[in-house]
Amino acid sequence: PRISEKTKIAVQQVAKNLNYQPNHLASALRKGKSNLVGVIIPRANSNFFSSVVEKMEEVLNSHGYNVIMTQSNESYEKECRNIDALLYTQVDGVIASMANETVELEYYQKIKSKGIPLILFDRGENDLEVDYVGIDDYMTSQMVVKHLVEEGCKRIAHIAGFQHSRIYKNRIRGYKDALVEFDLPISKDLIIESNLGIDDGRRSMKKLLELPIRPDAIYAAGDWAALGALQVLKEVGIKVPEEMALVGFSNEPFTSFVSPPISTINQHNSEIGRITAETFLDRMENPSKEVTLNKIILEAELIIRQSSKNK
């Protein structure tokens, strides 16, 4: 039966007086849509991830979606709990960048089995067959090595990420192939895998300095690891870049104001956020569209600063 306007107003007033909050889950189940997007990132304290999410949220908000952001803190177990929580909340889709610990893809397959969009950015795996947005990590590593060689470096060490992750695998592949291109030897002693935190950078740098012949350049696959390496070099009195060049990755804000400023890679964070959000919206607006996976690869930029030039 039709409800009169008078009754509607009376009900709304009572709801207001009782501070009534609608049941979001019930509403989502009834409508088949929640207008919520789940986002999983490794760390919120990373400028890369926070600025990607900021642009992503701006685009999604402008289309009526709200974002629920969770962080894995690089833990596979926490990432799995985040996925369960987001699915319970009836999100319309999930946008994620995988934790360093993540090897098993079972929980991501769980998202796919729900029939909702899953978009990966920065860290993703080909085996999942989902939309992906990121940079060309292989070419970017080659660009870094080329720059260091042009500055006169001949023994370039790489503080790498764990190799089960596609992006770090591509970075180390680009590094190795560039060394071959410039007729420089590939030495396993000069490659150290780590979680790329500041302490990892410190430990890796100390290990590299213990070698009989130390490197003359460090290429770290993350800025925090580069910062840790720089701290150790300062503590032992090795001049950067005169005695050792240094390049990081991600263009964290601190890289421009430490001394010396650290050369790094600009991944175009806002652009990744915008394209990732638009890819999600396209999936939502065209659910019956023939499934052609989007693999959008952006070209990164090498920002050359004092830590790696004028050797």
Indicate where each model-derived feature is located.
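Short beta->alpha connector loops
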Residues: 73-76, 99-103, 224
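Bacterial carbohydrate/catabolite-sensing allosteric modules
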Residues: 17, 58-63, 81-90, 105, ...
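N-terminal helix-turn-helix DNA-binding module of bacterial transcription factors
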Residues: 1-35, 309
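N-terminal winged-helix
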Residues: 41-58
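Short gly/ser/thr-rich secondary-structure transition/capping motifs
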Residues: 17-23, 77, 100, 230
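Intrinsically disordered, low-complexity polar regions and short flexible loop motifs
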Residues: 94
